[in-house]
């Protein structure tokens, strides 16, 4: 399986995670996944920094800007690693196998694709 296919599977997992519940992503995790996704998909920041009153957009832009110079492939690898690390941490507190039976089956399939 190619890096792009693994990355696409990881992105789909994040997109399909329930918004609430035991495996909801924190704001910091969302910011990490956002910035890595942008770097992996587009590369270095290609827009102006949002204004001071656009707090959320500015945080997202700053997080992406911090990845400047990271290759798109490296960003994809980091995205997949961040997802794997997140599930490792979740597994310390939750029976992930049982949880996976209750949610979108695509998540379970895609976790297997990325080596989880």
Swiss-Prot record:
InterPro entries: Acyl-CoA-binding_prot_CS, Acyl-CoA-binding_protein, Acyl-CoA-binding_sf, FERM/acyl-CoA-bd_prot_sf. GO terms for cellular component: cytoplasm. It comes from the Eukaryota. Gene3D superfamilies: 1.20.80.10. The keyword Transport applies. GO terms for biological process: fatty acid metabolic process; lipid storage. It holds the Pfam family ACBP. GO terms for molecular function: fatty-acyl-CoA binding. An acyl-CoA binds at residues 34-38, 60, 79. The keyword Transport applies. SUPFAM superfamilies: Acyl-CoA binding protein. Keywords: Lipid-binding, Transport. PROSITE patterns: ACB_1, ACB_2. Residues 3-92 form the ACB domain. Binds medium- and long-chain acyl-CoA esters with very high affinity and may function as an intracellular carrier of acyl-CoA esters. Belongs to the ACBP family. This is Acyl-CoA-binding protein homolog 3. It comes from Caenorhabditis elegans.
């Amino acid at each position: 399986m190619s890096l792009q296919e693994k990355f696409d599977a990881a992105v789909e997992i994040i997109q399909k995670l329930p918004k609430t519940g035991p495996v909801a992503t924190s704001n910091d995790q969302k910011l990490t996944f956002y910035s890595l996704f942008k770097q992996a998909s587009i590369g270095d920041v290609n827009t102006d920094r949002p204004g001071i009153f656009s707090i959320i957009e500015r945080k997202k832009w700053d997080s992406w800007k911090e990845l400047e110079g990271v290759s798109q492939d490296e960003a994809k690898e980091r995205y997949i690693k961040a997802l794997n690390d997140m599930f490792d941490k979740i597994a310390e507190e939750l029976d992930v196998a049982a949880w996976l039976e209750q949610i979108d089956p695509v998540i379970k399939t895609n976790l297997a694709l990325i080596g989880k």
